[in-house]
Swiss-Prot record:
Broad enzyme group: transferase
Region feature WRD domain, mapped onto this chain: 178-214
Record-level GO cellular component terms: nucleus
EC number: 2.3.2.27
Annotated protein name in UniProt: E3 ubiquitin-protein ligase BOI
Gene label: BOI
Amino acid sequence: MAVQAHHMNIFSQFISPNRDCVKFQENMNHGEFEFTGGEVPLITGESFAVEPLAAKANFNKAESGLSYNFTVPPLSTKRQRDFQFSDSNAPVKRRSVAFDSSSPSLINVELVSQIQNQQQSEIDRFVAQQTEKLRIEIEARQQTQTRMLASAVQNVIAKKLKEKDDEIVRIRNLNWVLQERVKSLYVENQIWRDIAQTNEANANTLRTNLDQVLAQLETFPTASAVVEDDAESSCGSCCGDGGGEAVTAVGGGCKRCGEREASVLVLPCRHLCLCTVCGGSALLRTCPVCDMVMNASVHVNMSS
């Protein structure tokens, strides 16, 4: 059957702006064409003959675009001559092509649905890829920030620990110094305690001796009584018979300077022979009466 056409490329109007929307498949087993796409366009142009089972259409999608391979069987010269001078204003004859689907509208719906599903799947895949990439970047940033934060916290903690260690060492040294000071103070306290106990014992002894001297002085009838022998001592070695301990009052004045009244008792000979000034002198070592070495002296209040 001959169809008048004005264009040699009979499939020029089959090419859609969206190349993924048009797909021709050839069913070689049934000898039919399966078309999945939009509405079937009108074929116009120069006259040529198309056999239903002779035409082959292969549309393959490549990376660079769409490539078409269409083979048209040779037309007979007679048929071309018959239709070469046909009236150009004559109505265009259409040829129906056998399709597997029932109607073009269903094909359009299925094609649109398939395109939408494909686009939706591509969008979902793209969104999933971008989401995964963004998640990886966020995780990497979080890990980097976490490491930086951990490093900063570790540095601060290490600095604080070093300061605490230094403070512990300083306090430990100070504690050792204080312990040594406490030990020295304890030893010094013991020494002073011993000295205090010794001085207290000496004071008690001197107080007892003073009480005895004062008691003996009260037994004399008058303070002007003198002993005939100035060299006589009250020591036990000087008293041959009785061995009693008596105080010997030598004259009324000081045996060293002779100017003031004798008010200092010399021990251990117990001669009341020195005044207050001579008794407090550090140069006097012996008793001026008996020349006995002095080990102590007692001031006696002679006022009544």
